[in-house]
């Protein structure tokens, strides 16, 4: 909730950050991701009418704005690129939806080619696995997409929904960017109220 997107210079010896510079007044920047070749930066603005901005990273570290498109929902909180770099995946927390944005040749973004709305009963307010005396609660008042990413093969896409206690799974058409729900379409969390947020793949890509 600061002024926007900042750039820093990193001291390679000490790790210290310096030369703080405001490069965009994009409100409530919630997530950043960089293309595999390091030439493009993507930033999500977690606002009601969510947007994603694309920036070209110049050799001197300066950013050049490419464009801005709708995130496909409200409150985008997570961005990730497919392994081939052709699509940007977006998780919209407030609306509980996910979207697929095509990446153009110059790194700019096109409007969403696919969007899916999470639906289902809200999960338990308190985690069933919480230790005795815990005050832990989760945002289980409806769907809240929290993370989205493709597996290392680029054939499948997974997304977590904190509010519904689910991990959704899709088949990805890498040419069109369309997502098709797998069978089953989702996996329930390990226990009620667990509120899945993030995941990682094994190095071999055969586990999550």
Where are these regions (language model features)?
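Short loop/turn segments immediately following beta-strands, especially the blade-tip
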Residues: 9-15, 55-62, 100-110, 170-179
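Structural signal for beta-propeller blades
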Residues: 5, 49-52, 96-99, 165-167
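Asp-box/WD-like beta-propeller blade repeats and closely related beta-sheet repeat scaffolds
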Residues: 62-147
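Residue-level detector of Asp-centered blade-edge/turn motifs that repeat once per structural unit
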Residues: 36-38, 83-84, 152-153, 203-205
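Beta-rich catalytic cores
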Residues: 28-30, 75, 144, 195
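Short loop/turn segments immediately following the C-termini of beta-strands
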Residues: 1, 46-47, 93, 103, ...
